[in-house]
Amino acid sequence: MNLMEKLDALPADCFRSRRICFQRIRTEEDLFRMGLLSLPPEQQAAVNPLWFSLGRAYIAPEQNVPFLILQRVDERPAVIGFIQLHKRLGTEREALSWSFFIIPAFQGMGLGAEAAKLAISLLRSAMPEVPIHLSVERDNSAAQRLYAKLGFCLSRERDGDDLVYVLP
């Protein structure tokens, strides 16, 4: 089974944590809501652009699964970010990964760490035998600190100019 099928086989409660949930992007309304997300210019270089992530999902949908990140605000779900879980293509070894961001209004609240923990849980539940590798821009020290705190180790491998962190 591919990543999409494995994720689809998981129970709905696997996609929720204490404060957030991942909602699969399936409709035009979801695409519109995703299109409203933006980061300030100084943060844009640290993450894949949304068009690139959606392009990956279009080219290989079975291995690239996009989600909105939602949090309840005033009893209604608010879109606070985006995450795409994917199986890395074109690498020597099979690996799982993600691209994600939280919009500025919700940064600094621990929601990025919560999203990363939820992503780890989902990927481990879907494909426990496949390691998780994350590519990180050299100057994205916030992501590097977060991934180290979550148990990732810096690898000697590089993804172009990016550092690669591996969860053993």
Language model segments and positions:
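Short loop/turn motifs at secondary-structure junctions
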Residues: 96, 128-130, 151
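Conserved GNAT acetyl-CoA-binding A-motif
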Residues: 125-135
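Conserved beta-strand-loop-alpha-helix junction that forms the acyl-donor binding cleft
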Residues: 133-144, 160-163, 168
